[in-house]
Amino acid sequence: KAPEHFLDANGIRQVSEEARTGRRGFIRHAFAAAAAATATPVAWSHGNPIPPEGGDPNILNLPEHATGLGQGVATEGYGKPSKYESNIQRRQSPGLTQTSQASVSFAPLQSLFGIVTPSGLHFERHHQGWWDIDPSKHRFMINGMVKTPTVLTMDEIMRLPAVSRFHFIECGANTAVEWGNVAVPTVQYTHGMISCSEFTGVPLITLLEMAGADLKQGKFVLAEGADGSSMTRTIPMSLITSGEVLVAYGQNGEMLRPENGYPLRLVVPGVQGVSWVKY
């Protein structure tokens, strides 16, 4: 398995010194080392060797799972990964920020398959921490250049026609840890501020039309989140009228996770993740 933590101080120092000799030389040495490793025969390159006399105990001795009863149905009301996969987690970069409430956690890309990021491993980016908001008390408000200022509850939003779409979201700072130099061991820390999910929600244009928004004179929508930072971003009306922007409540077949905006967030394809305003 790929290492899950940063290089130690000596490793970082060595990488830094090698990088100073020039990027081309650094890459040339890396390829040379890789070629040498490929040319060197190793015992495991052709599969496991035939076990010594007596056989493989993992085959000959029946394990407990082959002889006894396992766990019953609904032992876990909400399924979770195997304990043998416990090393696959979101991780934060030590010292990146002074507080974890205004920081980022990285998705373990090197350990994932396909294009969908499990909701529990989706990268995080917060500006004032995350909250588990009571959906029964949450409100979605529309005002400004509209005929009817509108307030919607979660129940009202979820009764409207919805769509489900796969979208990538990426933080604008993705890969920033290597802008200065190579200093981390896996793509989790270099590219882990990107994730892909199937999002479910109502097109924002539907809600604006309900409120009688002036779609011709209005050029932008100012989206504001309900967290302590009052995160705001402008969204071009051209994106909204295309039907691409969603007011989403679902992620990968279930409700959004609190770390990713539960119970409601914007999905704004094609722009930096900071515009996907949460809460």
Each predicted region: which residue ranges?
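N-terminal secretory signal peptides
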Residues: 1-25, 46
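N-terminal export signals
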Residues: 23-48
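Glycine-centered secondary-structure boundary/capping sites
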Residues: 11, 34, 38-43, 61, ...
